[in-house]
């Protein structure tokens, strides 16, 4: 089915900042749309998110230039192409851009069209998006890793590390895992309130209290797991994303929100090894900075046999960078963010490379999200087994969980739940 029109518009994300929505229409009248997210803590090697830098509009964060690139540069070249030829469409947009990091058109322009094309193709064939992208065997529901305490760049508090997540893995299905996570989220709220802490939430829906230390964040989560009636490590484990690239200053890690202390790479590895021995941590994302490859190698050698070590800023969903990490024996898992690389095809290529080399894949939202649920379908399509998309509140986060509930119902008896094997080393 041929594409007859492509239109882009400027709309708002969950932080009130502009983002790009694209709509694709076909000759049979089918239409589909998609909206791109935006990150706060971003890797240096991410594809370029094009902003207008006009101080008179949205504080310089407008995306009218990216919208114009879709309507004026991309649409004329893509109209008339077969909507199911995702790879050719993505390749054409990359060729038009002409840069390695999509700096001309903007990854937000290219990805909006790429995602909208995939969704419209699925609709035209009468298929759910997960089935269209993943084929007949797509049936694995992920563990919902829920970000219940926010720190770092995601919250205005004294916690250095960015995300403290719960992973409810000992469940018979996704729906029950989500229930376990939501109950723990509410138990945590009760505990924080009882301790006199604020229960306001950060960008991703997690609480953002002024805790006394980073360790206290883990300890109150463990209390919440027990208060909700579950066993830490047996039913629900902990995933961390300290986002240490944001802490990397002058060759050391600066604890910039708490006590202003610093640690060397060796000391950070010691810290994570200590935490892994003390707490039920199944996954550690960006435990070292994106440019600290020696530190990453030390961390992988030290705890990589027992803990999932996820490269986010390190790899930026980029197959070429992942290949370098594989060759060097760095990390054992990769975070998947569509807008880090900027097209559906390239994202699928990166996932394929990771799976080929026994690296786990962990699909992720961004801190500036929307009601778009593409990543829920992508997670099932690729059998990733893990997704992080915020906490148990904020509708732009819950939208992804609700889509996964729908997918599980659609699959019926064919649905499988990843469980703790999603993190297994």
Swiss-Prot record:
Pfam families cross-referenced by the UniProt entry: Enolase_C, Enolase_N
InterPro entries per UniProt: Enolase, Enolase-like_C_sf, Enolase-like_N, Enolase_C, Enolase_CS, Enolase_N
Biological-process GO terms, alphabetical: glycolytic process
Enzyme Commission code: 4.2.1.11
Subcellular location: Cytoplasm; Secreted; Cell surface
Residues noted as binding (2R)-2-phosphoglycerate in the record, renumbered to the chain: 162, 337, 366-367, 388
The protein's name in its UniProt record: Enolase
Organism: Gloeobacter violaceus (strain ATCC 29082 / PCC 7421)
Gene: eno
